[in-house]
Amino acid sequence: RKGRRDKVAKVKTAALKGSPQRRGVCTRVYTTTPKKPNSALRKVARVKLTSQVEVTAYIPGEGHNLQEHSMVLVRGGRVKDLPGVRYK
């Protein structure tokens, strides 16, 4: 009759809507602390993308000049020790 359904792979970067990168505007720039064995102040930003989705994005590198209303280009890629941060 009907065979078993194939599992549909879950999209890890849904907010990018299939694009490699997406532009956005920083709504909040702040620091958070990582999960248990690690200790630091990781720089992250809340970004409203052109796809009208608001995501939390990591700010890589040492030092940055981002503030509220800064235009940023967001790509996929999670930060393992920050829960909920799936963009850079």
Curated annotation (Swiss-Prot):
Modified positions (3-methylthioaspartic acid) in chain numbering: D81
One GO molecular-function entry: structural constituent of ribosome
Region of interest called Disordered, as start-end residue ranges on this chain: 1-24
CDD domains with a match to the protein in the record: Ribosomal_S12
Classification via PROSITE patterns: RIBOSOMAL_S12
GO BP: translation
One annotated Gene Ontology cellular component of this protein: small ribosomal subunit
Keywords: Methylation, Ribonucleoprotein, Ribosomal protein, RNA-binding, rRNA-binding, tRNA-binding
InterPro entries found in the cross-reference section: NA-bd_OB-fold, Ribosomal_uS12, Ribosomal_uS12_bac
Highest taxon above the source species: Bacteria
Matches recorded under PANTHER family: 30S RIBOSOMAL PROTEIN S12 FAMILY MEMBER
Function (record text): With S4 and S5 plays an important role in translational accuracy. Interacts with and stabilizes bases of the 16S rRNA that are involved in tRNA selection in the A site and with the mRNA backbone. Located at the interface of the 30S and 50S subunits, it traverses the body of the 30S subunit contacting proteins on the other side and probably holding the rRNA structure together. The combined cluster of proteins S8, S12 and S17 appears to hold together the shoulder and platform of the 30S subunit.
Subunit organization: Part of the 30S ribosomal subunit. Contacts proteins S8 and S17. May interact with IF1 in the 30S initiation complex.
Family stated for the protein in its record: Belongs to the universal ribosomal protein uS12 family.
Protein name (database record): Small ribosomal subunit protein uS12
